[in-house]
């Protein structure tokens, strides 16, 4: 089995204690922990700051990556947090996700949309609107997934431990995320 995880800094395993975008060690990243639990190859296609691809260059880059990684058994997509952090509305973000998922040339049964866990108050999260929007985004993503016939995993209530910024998972948070995602995918 081969799984491609396409996401942002939390998929990448960003360690906010490092100034230049470093990663947690593999044993503390949810992608690598999931690979161990599932006993399969899991490709980490996380990127710091990534928003939902919508520009031609971003879409071409995704298409090339997908082509290079095929055949795949599952494509896990977890994006939208950075779109919210940039001030976009839940409606805009969910429309972007729908447009992105619609163009992916895989069987819909192979696509899993993961609604991101809750953000918490922290250095990056000083506006309660973002906390509410994160929950609302999961509800909107559920609707998108049902409409498109892709699988949806809602991570809203997984109680993911985050770092001082309120956004990035701690090492404990990565462990909790991997455990919950493993159970959701079984």
Identify the function of each model-found stretch.
Residues 1-47, 51-55, 63-68, 175:
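Serine-esterase "nucleophile elbow" of acetyl-processing enzymes
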Residues 28, 36-37, 60-186:
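Alpha-helical cap/lid subdomain in secreted, periplasmic
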């Amino acid at each position: 089995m081969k799984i491609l995880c396409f996401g942002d800094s939390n998929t990448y395993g960003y360690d906010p204690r490092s100034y230049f975008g470093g990663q947690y060690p593999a044993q503390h990243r949810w992608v690598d922990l999931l690979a161990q639990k599932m006993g399969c190859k899991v490709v980490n296609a996380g990127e710091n700051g990534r928003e939902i691809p919508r520009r031609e260059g971003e879409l071409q880059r995704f298409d090339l990556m997908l082509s290079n990684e095929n055949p795949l058994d599952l494509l896990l997509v977890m994006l939208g947090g950075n779109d919210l952090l940039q001030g976009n509305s839940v409606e805009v973000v969910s429309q972007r996700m729908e447009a992105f998922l619609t163009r992916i040339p895989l069987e819909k049964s192979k696509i899993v949309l993961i609604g991101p866990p809750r953000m918490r108050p922290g250095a990056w999260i000083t506006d309660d609107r973002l906390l509410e929007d994160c929950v609302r985004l999961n509800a909107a993503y559920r609707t998108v997934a049902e409409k498109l016939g892709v699988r949806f995993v809602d991570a809203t209530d997984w109680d993911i431990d985050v770092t001082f910024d309120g956004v990035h998972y701690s090492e404990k948070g990565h462990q909790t995320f991997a455990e919950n995602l493993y159970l959701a995918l079984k």
